[in-house]
Structure formats: C-alpha cells, structure tokens
Amino acid sequence: MRPIFIMVKCELGRAYDTAEHAVDEIEEVSEIYSISGQFDLMIKCYLPEDMDVGRFVNSRIHALPHIRDTMTLITFNAFAGRG
C-alpha cells in the first residue's frame, strides 16, 4: 500500500462536513486532520500500488461535497521516530 496526502480547501464553514463525508464514503481514507494555513483539511489515504492516483483523486476526492481545491502529495519513504 502506498500512502498519499491530499490537502483540501473547502467552501467556508464546510470543512467538517467534507471530512465526515470522506471518512464515511472512502475506504482508502486512513486519517483526516483539520489544519491551519491555505488548506482546511489534510487527508491521508493508503492506495494499492497499482491504483492510478490521479484517477482516485479525480473520481473519489473531487466528488466529495464542498471542495474548492486540492493538492496531492505522493510519498517516497516513511521515517519513524522512537516512540
């Protein structure tokens, strides 16, 4: 499985609604964080290695309600701390 992060900008006041829909409707979603800055949410997903990331984002993430913009980050390596 390959982790990706999707930064999501939502319509004003609708970030929590969007997060709830994502958790309920998209099984690949692992975690969602509300964040500060130019985006409202950071969604962590685990995708099968052979899944088309662009198609997943376009068909599943962009279909969520109240989304205005996204930025997808594809991971290379994971580093873990001690504890």
What does each model-found stretch correspond to?
Residues 1-83:
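A compositional/biophysical signature of low hydrophobicity enriched in polar/charged and small residues
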